[in-house]
Amino acid sequence: PESAMLFFSVAMLYFFSEWIDREGWWRFVLMTLCATLAFLTKLPTICLGLPLLYLCLQKYKLYFLTQWKLWFFATISILLTFLWYNHSNYIKTIDGSISNNTLSFRYYVFEYSIYLALKLSFYKKVFFSEVFEKDLIYAGGVLFIIGIIFTLKKKEFRYIHYWLLAILIYFFLAAKEVVWHTYYTIPIIVPASVFIGYAISNSLKLLTAYKVTGIKKIILQAFFIVMVVLLPLISYHKITGRYKAKRLEKDYPVQIAGKIVDETARENDLVIGCIWGGPELLYYCNRRGWTMDSNICSVERIESLRREGADYFVTTKLDVIDSSVIDYLKKNYET
């Protein structure tokens, strides 16, 4: 969903800025549609309201509060999002399971965000390991910082600055997910690309503007060239590294288990895939069914799904699942 989220987010920001400048109902409809779809794809994208607010203040000052079209836009996009997430939370509780309310500010901020924000490991994991190392692959990270420094006083970049700030706020509000799932930092790549592109395309102009001459100019020019050359080289290394056999070893048991089920089970059999809660086992089994977290796997939950039609229980986490659950399955079912 991250690709869809980025697409709708960028489209929302673009059409909103176009509507602010030239208005028009077709722009209004497109910006409202894209905003709603962005919020529905990933709830924290609501933080992108910050650059939208900046544009409103730029054009209307405080009189934006009297613009009924802005209120209509906010009401439609946020109300539809609220109704959907409220419904999805209700769906989770139908079978009696406990659901963490995805609309709960208290759940996100007071139970996780504040705690994580006070830990140095959070900043190292998110901003260095994920953003600087994986998302921007070192060279891009350096150019990103340079781009920010050189655009701090440029008003035409203020919109992008607020966009970046909104994403940083989102990192803290959704700190639990950002730390756990590496792909949650992907949204920063879009505004970062603007700053990186500015730093690269204006390197010579920037050197002239700041009156850098002599050996310093040569060193800085060489630095920019090295950064640009390193980007594709590091990218190639990162991508090919993910396909090395040693890195893929952890997925082999899941693939093997899935293949066995695919060859054994009937086409319409339903499967319980028990690893860490992800869908990989169902994917390799080529069957529909349910996912289950091996850390909280229980006899009660398994039996509940069996009554709903589950035919197979598949796992590669025998060392993680409670031994009493394994003993129960071996005693009562064919293994």
Task: List where the protein language model places each region.
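Membrane-interface alpha helices of multi-pass inner-membrane proteins
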Residues: 15, 27-43, 49, 168-170
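Transmembrane-lumen/periplasm boundary regions of multi-pass, lipid-linked membrane glycan transferases
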Residues: 37, 48-155, 168-179, 230-237
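Transmembrane alpha-helical segments
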Residues: 8-20, 31-34, 46, 50-57, 144-148, 199-204, 217-249, ...
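Periplasmic/luminal catalytic loop of GT-C fold multi-pass membrane glycosyltransferases
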Residues: 140, 298-335
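Membrane-interface transmembrane helices that cradle and orient dolichyl/undecaprenyl
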Residues: 12-28, 38, 62, 151-152
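Short periplasmic/luminal acceptor-recognition loop of GT-C membrane glycosyltransferases, typified by
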Residues: 251, 255, 261-298, 311-318
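Hydrophobic/aromatic-rich transmembrane helices and adjacent perimembrane loops
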Residues: 2-5, 38, 47, 161-170, ...
